[in-house]
Every structure is written in C-alpha cells, then in structure tokens.
Amino acid sequence: LSDRSAVKMGHILGEFFWMLIPNRRKKLALRNIFRGNITKDVKTAEEISKAAAVRFGTIGMSVFRFPLLNKKNISDYVVIQGKEKLDEILASGEGCIIAGNHCGNWELEGAALALYGYPILAVGMKQSNEGFDKFIREYRSIPGQTVEYKTGVRDMLRRLKEGYFVGLLCDQDPGDTGLISPFLGQKTL
C-alpha cells in the first residue's frame, strides 16, 4: 500500500471499529468531554470522541508499516525538532527519560527515535490478549526499540546508566500506585 492508501485504510478501519464500540463507552467519552469543559456543544463533543477513537485505525496501520521504515526514509515521516539536545545526551552516554503521552502517533514516535539512532527502551504494559501482546512487542522492536514491561525504578536506573533513552507514557492508569492530581478541573488518578 502507498502511504496515502495506508492512511485511508486506517481511517476506514477506525470508522468500522467505531461502530463496534458499545454505546455506554461512547456516552462515557461524551461525559468526560463535558466534565473537562472542552465544549458544551453535543455535536462537537460527539465529533471529538469519534475522531479520538477513529485515529487508532491510522495508528494501527502505521505499526503494520514499521517493516518499511528505515534510517534513510524516516525523515520523510518524522522530523525531530530540538534533535541537537538529544544528540548531546546521546554523546554524554548518560541516557534520559522521555516522558510522553498517548497523543499523536506515539507508536511512530518511538520507532522514529530508534531509527534516528537513539537507544530507545519502550516501557509498556503487558496486554491482556496474549496474541496482541506478542504482535505489538515484535513490531515495536522492528525499528530497533528495546521493549520491556513496566519495571521497577532500579531496572530503569540501570538502563539509564547504560545510556538508554527510557520512553514512558505518563497518561496510563497507574492502579494503586498512582497519585491523585488535577486534570481538566477534575481529580484524576
């Protein structure tokens, strides 16, 4: 598939899966949009919630295309602003923590960093579906990321000392270990 066809196919897949999302989940998304005072307009809230869900189709298609990415073509897809700072950290050999969230195409971000030559440790959560877990771990490793499940602080410190750029997505549900913090006017975990 061409890039354009892959994006279109991803959007179609996202639209299809949107139809399968239970109405209670869609209503929950609307309530959260209203609670966060993002909009008061029902139609706008519906558009936001649908777009947020449909984009997963495009993200999924980009993961399927990881085998096509390489060091020569990655700059056609991702350009890093502030790359000189990352280069300084890489040259120091000290490693760093890259804190991100599930915004944009986080899967492509990690792949791009690895293809740009940064030693990426993608820290993720084990997926409940064993087959999907195996797939996502394998595909994340194709562009050169090292993938590990959530580990302890000592393990991350060891990886930092080894010079890894430790990627953490900070908007994940921390379970019992999280801190309650304000977000969009609400107390959240």
Per-region residue spans from a language model:
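Membrane-anchoring hydrophobic helices of lipid-metabolizing enzymes
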Residues: L1-G100, K134-Y139, G144
